[in-house]
Amino acid sequence: LTAVFTRRNPENALARRNLVLDRMASAGAITRYQRDSIAALPILLNYKPVSHNEGPATYFREMLRLTMNAERPKRRQFQNDWDYEQAVKEYDENPIYGWCLKNTKADGTPYDIYRDGLKIYTTIDSRMQEYAEQAIQKQMESVIQPQMDAQFKRTKTLFIDADRQERERIMRNAIRYSDRYYQMQKAGVDEKTILASFDKPCPMKIFTYKGERDTVLTPRDSILHHKRIMRAAMVSLDPATGFVKAYVGGPNFRYFKYDMAKQGKRQIGSTIKPFVYTFAIDHLGLSPCTPVPNLPVTIETANGVPWSPKEAGKVEQNGEMHPLSWGLARSRNNYSAWIMKQAKQPQAVANFIHNMGIHSYIDPVPALCLGTSESNVYEMVSAFSTFANEGVYTTPIFVTRIEDRQGNLIASFAPRTQDAISEHTAYTMLTMLEGVIHSGTGGRLGWAYNMQNVEVGGKTGTSQKNRDAWFMCVLPKLVAGCWVGGEDQAVRLVSRGEGSVIALPIVGEFLNRIYADPSTGISKQDLFTRPAVMPVYDCDETEKTDDSATRYEEDEFFE
């Protein structure tokens, strides 16, 4: 084949084509006039080599490559023992991790995903993947990035609340991890010359959400430009099967290699609150209608220092009694703290949350109820799927089978499941998460994306000082989550950077595209599975439509 490969051997390819034309003419398949006319034409190629930087699901493909080629985790790769132990457990128990090293061919050598002709069947739905990428592109291009650009133009400040030492540290690390630095160092260029090159203007391409742009900048200014680009990540999966349907780790894999869907972890803010409320229902015997006083809460911590969370903005704490569901819908910090005070043991709450699917380390302190811990979109979506899967946690799965080049099955994969909570608790939490959408901080999904009459639950989240914006969404057949933020936590939107403002619209856009495509199998008529015997909770306040609440942009900072 190489001998007549058009790109490598154009003369041989031309001779071979004309030979075929001669034989077709001799057989009467074409006339001699047609043969002569075609033979006079050159062979034109529309050749474009396949690049790992382009095409659909670039972040997913890279995650798959890294996963299948992964070595057993080492302690030095993790900040704490807990995360290291969880990574080792996942590596040992999940066969897709390190598959190429764990399995060998007949000759005893490991599999090579590049050379062995493997056919890897993934769970990604090409339609949903496209819709997720389109939703992120639309919101980032039209709303979020212009907001950041306007802020930078107004303030002339990129790294918010960062002193000179911190700004220098950020830039120093960015330079030393850049491809330019690596290539020059590899070529033997000395450090002084390398660093000087970052201040010399040169022609280059830079990323914008409107497309690549040719310009002349210093490499240092190029780094600053790309630091200003806001990032977003989204994951969606089928809660019943654990199949990952869409996976977007960032805006453009060529320019931003770091995967914020699974690789990067950020503070999860109020997206942890549904799990704290689940503990209250499952372990403390409370219900959505349990009355709780709207008052400040103080808890004495293990070291004897009292802790009392603050509320964001001008929130009135007037002592009125409201049902527990009211606190979740409005994401009140004092209601989450009240649950922690009843629980008494933060470690018990942390263990419970781990069992529901958040395997990242959770510091067992009262403040865990406000989302001070870190996780990623992939993990959060899988944990939220427990609510839609009748209380059963299903590990995410993104490969179903692997075949060799002859089509022989050599590996198949199935999700692992564990009972996390009862189906009654799961359904109760679904009704409370619906309250977040229909009468709480997630109201924008209803009135802006026409989902007032859809069975959909969700939770907004915003970490301190708008560093991280989150939105998690639960449907009967799909769970989706989105994170928005800067590459560095010092890069953030000072105002209007809350989860309900910048993360929720991405999910809303994604869902509307799915609903508009019947072939996805997702419909606005889908219903959550209700247990055969289920108490009816009729909390008067949660049934009222509170327009001011649903249009409220929460500012869920914690201190």
Where are these regions (language model features)?
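Non-catalytic, structured segments within soluble enzyme domains
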Residues: L1-Q183, I339, H354-N355, H359, ...
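Second-shell loop/turn segments in exported
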Residues: T2-E11, V20-L21, A25, L45-G55, ...
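Extracytoplasmic/secreted proteins, especially bacterial periplasmic and envelope-associated proteins
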Residues: N12-R23, S37, Y59, M63, ...
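Conserved catalytic neighborhood of penicillin-recognizing serine enzymes
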Residues: K48-L66, L286-P346, Y393, R405-L430, ...
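A penicillin-recognizing enzyme superfamily signal
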Residues: T58, T122-S142, N173-D238, F243-V248, ...
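A small/polar active-site loop signature that marks catalytic segments
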Residues: Q86, N103, N333-H354, T460
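Active-site rim segments in enzyme catalytic domains, especially the processed small/beta chain
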Residues: D259, Q263-N303, S439, N512
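Mid-domain, small-residue-enriched loop/turn segments at the edges of structured enzyme/sensor domains
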Residues: P306-E311, A343-S382, G391, T395
